[in-house]
Curated annotation (Swiss-Prot):
Keywords: RNA-binding, Transcription, Transcription antitermination, Transcription regulation. Involved in transcription antitermination. Required for transcription of ribosomal RNA (rRNA) genes. Binds specifically to the boxA antiterminator sequence of the ribosomal RNA (rrn) operons. It comes from the Bacteria. This is Transcription antitermination protein NusB. GO terms for biological process: DNA-templated transcription termination; transcription antitermination.
Length: 131
């Protein structure tokens, strides 16, 4: 059975595809999660995260932009942006402890993103939590 970390990783992949302009990905979310063996409770968890992030994307992106020290949303890599979007959705709309959400985002960024991403993601999420 898949873990929540694996479910989040799948959601990041879906958000990444969505960010690259594949709006049609929303039609295939169920099949993609099934292919990655994300099932039952974890599938419900992943669907909630993906759909919630997409539904609240404008508000999430506003949070990112307003907490950047410099640059714009388009300056952030797609993987890093996907990790941030998911984490910010969880911070704003889910009831998990903020420290767990931030730690999970940092760990996922170590595996999926560029070398400087964990520090950048940690700093930005920390600012958002403290705002």
């Amino acid at each position: 059975m898949a873990t929540r970390t694996q479910a989040r990783e799948s959601v990041i992949g879906l958000l990444y595809a969505y960010d690259l302009g594949n709006d049609g990905i929303t039609k295939f979310v169920d099949e993609i999660l099934e292919e990655k063996k994300i099932r039952n409770n974890q599938k419900d968890f992943a669907l909630n995260l993906f759909n919630g992030t997409i539904k609240n994307l404008s508000q999430i992106d506003e949070n990112i932009v307003s907490n950047l020290n410099q640059g714009t949303l388009s300056d952030i890599g797609s993987v890093e942006k996907s990790i941030l979007r998911l984490a910010i959705y969880e911070i704003l709309f889910e009831s998990l402890p903020k420290a767990i959400i931030i730690n999970e985002a940092i760990e996922l960024s170590k595996r999926l993103a560029s070398d400087g991403a964990p520090k950048f993601i940690n700093g930005l999420l920390d600012k958002i939590v403290k705002a």
